[in-house]
Amino acid sequence: MKEYRVYLERARFFQQDFLYPLIFREYIYGLAYSHKDPRSIFVENGGYDNKYSLLNVKRLITRMYQQNHLIISTNDSNKNPFFGYNKNFDFQIIAEGFAILVEIPFLPQLSSSLEEAEIIKSYKNVRSIHSIFPFLEDKFTYLNYVSDIRIPYPIHLEILVQILRYWVKDVSFFHLLRLFLYDFSNWIPTKKSISTFSKSNPRLFLFLYNFYVCEYESIFLFLRNKSSHLRLKSFSVFFERIFFYAKREHLVEVFSKDFSYTLPFFKDPNIHYVRYQGKCILASKNVPFLMNKWNHYFIHLWQCFFDVWSQPRTININQLSEHSFQLLGYFSNVRLNRSVVRSQMLQNTFLIEIVSKKLDIIVPFIPLIRSLAKAKFCNVLGHPISKPVWADSSDFDIIERFLRICRNLCHYYHGSSTKKSLYRIKYILRLSCIKTLACKHKSTVRAFLNRSGSEELLEEFFTEEEEILPWKFQILTLLCHSQSFSLHRYERKYRIWYLDILFSNDLVNDE
């Protein structure tokens, strides 16, 4: 954040929200270069010292303006007339420049909002993706229905650019950005353009996509606030609108005449919304009628305001006590715990049944097996196989790689209610490691274990993750000398969420 502020001070003489002049500033690309790997894309093709070149950027922009798009034939659609022979190199140069530029105007707003909220010290904990689950444990036990929604992707990059236009007023900059995306779409098929663009230029795509999500969420929050604070009559009118800012007077008359007795059912203060990446969850306590209303408005909002088609099957409404929903690699549902309490009053005895709710969060075993099979650690049935690609490494490096994967998975899934599936995953990784070592030494698994010692080899796979546990629990173990307390029992009974996890594990399948 401080590095960006320095460069913002140097660009003060430019008019606010005018980004086009910054394209030709060398420090913009130097900033992008400093945050990347030394094998950066900002290099001269025939240079001596592998540094980025502002001259290349200027040449590419000049070529973009000089290109005549009317003479491009359909037979040459696979060839890129602008980018030439080194199209990937040139394309990423411009894309990184655009990514840096569109981020600059919003960084001061982000820093000021964080300072006003006074959450700088705990910002890392707020950023943790596992901070969602304590919220679910506190709120979802009182709810009954959940709507699992997958946010649709924009069908064209132009939609993302149009959303950004509401925030940044610079005609020249957006003209160049559209010209750049137009040249990009000429040599990429239309159906694959958005996916190819997101893979080759994740920084620029994520920025544009986050603005798309932010825009739709701002409208959703407006709906949510109105549903809580408006009177019932206004609230009912608001819910019957398809186009949110039109046709209000007519709907007032319709609702006042036909639906005056059903107005109280529309109010739902216990509605909760959670989103991560391209998936969101909407939970409510009332009957699923209100959830259906919200889903209809989501679909109309995406289709009418963003021109994005959403398939109906991407939105599912389920009862929490009967169905589970998938979020961040976990399967979660609300489990009903029934217990019988005996009560005695004078000479009469009563049996009272108490039903309590508990959020059950478990490790999805089958999706993990699919991820391990895709990574070539086992087959589709879960049988461990060797990893011949790693056979060229030393024994220590092979063991360290498997241990790192195992520890990361245990660290990520430590908040699970039951850890039996996690122990089976550790067993698969252990046997895959042994088979990889046996393949390297050109021996069988049995002969390799007899030679190395099966008891001492890879014992870290079955040790408890006490080094991962917080230091508070370790101190508690040292202070408590009673045999009734055990860290292992505490670990099995309670869930522990780590707030240092900022990204999903590579093997986590959250489809």
Curated annotation (Swiss-Prot):
GO terms for biological process: mRNA processing; RNA splicing; tRNA processing. Keywords: Chloroplast, mRNA processing, Plastid, RNA-binding, tRNA processing. One of its GO terms (cellular component) is chloroplast. Pfam families: Intron_maturas2, MatK_N. One of its GO terms (molecular function) is RNA binding. InterPro entries: Domain_X (IPR024937), Maturase_MatK (IPR002866), Maturase_MatK_N (IPR024942). It is found in: Plastid, Chloroplast. Usually encoded in the trnK tRNA gene intron. Probably assists in splicing its own and other chloroplast group II introns. Belongs to the intron maturase 2 family. MatK subfamily. HAMAP family: MatK. This is Maturase K.
